[in-house]
Design a protein with these regions (language model features):
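Iron-sulfur cluster-binding electron-transfer modules in prokaryotic oxidoreductases
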Residues: 1-179
Length: 179
């Protein structure tokens, strides 16, 4: 299956090992991955700060880069939500761009959503002999409605002991940007 990977800014700049691990998982599951070189920030940081007009350049670039992709996978629920939902609203006064955004929005998936709901995989063959917890991010859980896929994948990691987090569905605040 051919997919285009939306590589999120924070992963690119600060956590490239996370991006590489995600690529390895997808390749192991039989995906042929393209990481478009012309992609930039999705623009959601501008939108979250109230700068919708400033976001339009990044938004239009993302649409142009990904509009011919069959599947787009993002390891960031925030970016996936922005592309899936916010783009059409921000481009509402530009019908042609809004239509193009709508087509892209139908093809974007959050990482765990893609693995479980599209590939039909709940066990990626991982082993991790330690205790972990999981923060259920606002964008993934509440705005995108993705609740089961991350948990199904965690449940099937051999050796993993899952410890529920207090207030797991509370907002992390992302340094105040989302609150």
């Amino acid at each position: 299956m051919k997919i285009h990977l939306f590589s999120q800014c924070l992963i690119d700049m600060f956590y490239p090992h996370v991006g590489m691990a995600g690529v390895q998982v997808l390749e192991r599951l039989g995906c042929d991955i393209t990481v478009p070189k012309k992609q930039v920030c999705c623009g959601q940081m501008f939108v979250n700060s109230g700068y919708n007009d400033a976001a339009k350049g990044a938004i239009k670039n993302t649409i142009e880069v990904f509009e011919n992709a069959e599947y787009i996978v993002s390891m960031s629920g925030s970016c996936a939500f922005a592309i899936r939902d916010e783009y059409r609203h921000i481009l509402a006064d530009e019908p042609e761009w809004m239509a193009r955004a709508a087509k892209v929005s139908e093809r974007i998936y959050e990482f765990t959503e893609f693995i479980v709901n599209v590939l039909g995989v709940t066990d990626v063959g991982a082993t991790f002999n330690d205790k972990v917890t999981y923060h259920k991010s606002c964008h993934v859980t509440r705005l995108m409605g993705i609740k089961e896929p991350p948990m199904k994948l965690l449940e099937n990691i051999k050796g993993l002991e899952y410890l529920p987090m207090n207030r797991a569905e509370g907002c992390c605040g992302f340094g105040g940007t989302f609150t």
